[in-house]
A protein has these predicted regions:
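Short alpha-helical transmembrane segments in multi-pass integral membrane proteins
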Residues: 1-28, 86-151, 195-251, 307-372, ...
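Helix-terminus/linker motif at the lipid-water interface of multi-pass membrane proteins
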Residues: 36, 40-59, 128-135, 191-198, ...
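N-terminal transmembrane alpha-helices
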Residues: 15-52, 66-81, 85, 110-117, ...
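Short runs within selected transmembrane alpha-helices of multi-pass transporters and secretion channels
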Residues: 79, 148-166, 174-182, 203-216, ...
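Transmembrane helical elements of multi-pass membrane transporters/channels
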Residues: 26-45, 147, 181, 210-214, ...
Length: 454
């Protein structure tokens, strides 16, 4: 029975011993590179759309993002819950429970993916009309959304598979598969949009195929790996007890994602009221925004995995120290990138379009966002650490108050006092500051680090 132990160690990064900062860095760097790579191909997608199809098409694809995330947010929350459960069982070295958790997670992903496919296609037009999408943008936006949801199953299953890999500390695989998906997406964008002139439909189809590639590659690895989290297709079924635990941990994050996405839909509706140029400028900047947001979420995931493994092993001192190390790395990253983006704002925005009105809207957003990303890093870093103990309700409450309720109140009662779109932009850093303060007040209490297996 001792023989399989060596391959297991090679395929699983256990962060329950050794240098804390090295463990977190070894896990985080591949994850950050993968997310940056993913954002790079998303940005390339928008650059190709903006340059070959024009600002209206760029606005259509960009404005579809908020309603898409509104619908898929719950599945992403469940994937977080599954990752927490798997990481805790791996930390506790419980092979049987790890096996059950992995296969239940994938079964849940398939079910959610099928539901989202049908539901997303059905409500696409109604949702975009409700968001006050301008008529000149609506047709392309509906086309993009419907085609995107045609392949959303691949995205949901990949996210769950990546969550399992990350829970095992094997984030390098996520980078590899994202690289393959990124290259596929960019090539297909050029072929379908620039070559075959398929318009925004080509952009959506390219995204679907790239997600299929990452899904197949990740599942193939999980089926071949010699580790406790190896996948057997015949064993993929929902275990009632494990489903209950995954949903219990993932439900708050899922609800949080959906409600926050709903607030972003309201924000997007406000942007839409300023016209197609504002929509295009905001859409272009939000692609740049991802180069800050995704690494922040990567560090948050690192905190969740590190805390999950050490909490499962009962190493509470490492839990606390790991949170602070991860938080410091995340804040430092955002300070550096925010400064660089501000320094090169004009040439960056001109990559997307030559329309000076669109560029002006994008640069305006950059002025309000970039200096304050460290607040978002603080919020998500602490939330990720707390979530790693299985206590996902407190982060949910904080994020719902700051990133949803506060934004809704702002849009309804504060935004009318602003003459221009700046009132929408300033909403973001103010809500980040509120969330960071509330999360810090909870995290510093320390009660979430009490050791208890649920």
């Amino acid at each position: 029975m001792a023989a399989p132990a060596q391959p297991q160690q090679k395929k699983t990064l256990l962060m329950t011993e050794g240098s804390i900062w090295k463990s977190i860095l070894l896990f985080s760097v591949p994850l950050i590179l993968g997310n940056l790579l993913q954002q790079l191909y998303n940005t390339a997608d928008s650059i190709i759309v903006g340059n070959f199809l024009g600002s209206n098409a760029l606005a259509a694809v960009g404005s579809s993002g908020s309603p898409i995330y509104l619908l898929i947010g719950f599945s992403q929350g469940v994937a977080v819950g599954a990752g927490v459960v798997v990481s805790q069982y791996l930390g506790a070295k419980d092979k049987k429970e790890t096996h059950i958790a992995v296969h239940t997670s994938l079964a849940i992903a398939v079910i959610l993916g099928l539901i989202l496919t049908v539901g997303g296609i059905a409500v696409s037009r109604s949702l975009l009309v409700w968001m006050n999408t301008p008529e000149e943008v609506l047709g392309d936006a509906v086309t993009y959304m419907k085609l995107y949801f045609g392949g959303v199953l691949f995205s949901v299953v990949y996210n769950m598979a990546a969550g399992i890999l990350n829970a095992a500390g094997n984030s390098r695989r996520s980078v590899l598969y994202l690289a393959c998906a990124s290259i596929t997406n960019i090539i297909l964008d050029l072929v379908l949009i620039a070559g075959l002139k398929m318009g925004v439909a080509g952009a959506a189809i390219a995204t679907d195929i790239s997600q299929l590639v990452s899904c197949v590659l990740s599942l193939r690895f999980l089926m071949k790996v010699d580790a406790d989290y190896k996948v057997e297709l015949s064993a993929i079924r929902p275990d009632q007890r494990m489903t209950s635990r995954i949903i219990r941990i993932g439900l708050p994050t899922g609800i949080q994602n959906m409600v926050i996405s709903f607030s972003n839909v309201l924000v997007q509706s406000s942007v839409n009221s300023y016209g197609a140029a504002a929509m295009a400028g905001f859409a272009a900047y939000m692609k740049i925004d991802g180069f800050n947001i995704l690494p922040v979420t990567s560090f948050s995931m690192a905190a969740t995995t590190f805390v999950g493994q050490n909490y499962g092993a009962g190493n509470l001192k490492r839990v606390k120290n790991g949170m602070w190390v991860t938080l410091g790395m995340s804040v430092l990253y955002t300070l550096c990138t925010g400064t660089l983006l501000l320094a090169f704002q004009n040439p960056i925005m001109h990559l997307f379009t030559s329309d000076e009105t669109v560029v002006a809207f994008g640069c305006s957003a950059m002025h309000y966002f970039c200096p304050f990303y460290f607040l978002l890093a603080t919020l998500h870093g602490m939330a990720g650490a707390v979530r790693g103990t299985g206590r996902s309700v407190p982060p949910m409450v904080v994020l719902l108050i700051s990133l949803c309720l506060f934004r809704v109140v702002w849009i309804q009662f504060v935004l009318p006092f602003f003459a221009g779109i700046e009132g929408v932009f300033i909403l973001y850093p103010v809500s980040w500051a509120l969330g960071a303060v509330l999360m810090a007040l909870y995290a510093w209490k320390g009660s979430w680090m009490t050791y208890e297996h649920s």
